[in-house]
Amino acid sequence: NMMADEKKLNLTLRSRTKGAPEKVVEKKINWEAGKTALIICDMWDDHWCKSASRRVGELAGPMNAVVEAAREKGVFIIHAPSSVVSFYDKTPQRKLAKDAPFSKSPIPLSVKERWGTNWCWPDPKYEGVLPIDDSDMGCSCKGEKCEIREAWTRQIKTIELVKGDALTDNGQETWNLLAERKIDNVILC
């Protein structure tokens, strides 16, 4: 059925095992688009690290194309620009996140702030380690690290925020949105 196929996401998952990290494991899956959310995390308009800012600029256009394609298939889009959601306080996307009915999460959500922001530390009881070392707050410049400064004010404009999308940097609000829509699968970008 052509219409049913259009609402499916045919994906290849790639992972590595702790025992053999050099070996890539691939698995083909099919997800229902309507039971899938795509979360865009920390694609800010600027970064105090020059290399991070450059990477966001390079990724934003292709990421927006992926977001548009996912949205067209029926994937729910959540924008999650940590620590700058107040920029969006009066938007319908922010209202959608704030108004989602409360839903208790199956495990406690992390509430331990990281670097004085809403960005929470991963909880090793439930999550693996990040694939990068972010102990320096995200600078990957060679040699001398960039000076930390207040840099981001919003999500980069290249990634479109449209009607039906949500915007939050709060774990409980995110869980509420996912539960309300009976989302089974999440793609984190």
Feature names for model-found ranges:
Residues W48-G57, E160-D165:
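Second-shell loop/turn segments in exported
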Residues M2-E22:
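Basic, amphipathic N-terminal segments that precede the first structured/catalytic domain
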Residues C41, H79-P81, C189:
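Short His-Asn-centered micro-motif
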Residues N1, V186-C189:
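Short, intrinsically disordered, charge-balanced linker/junction segments flanking boundaries
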Residues W31-G34:
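Proline/glycine-enriched tight loop/beta-turn segments at coil->beta junctions
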Residues T36-S51:
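Acidic/histidine-rich, surface-exposed loop or edge segments in extracytoplasmic proteins
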Residues K28, G61, A65-D184:
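Active-site alpha/beta core segments
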Residues T36-A37, N185-I187:
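Structural motif
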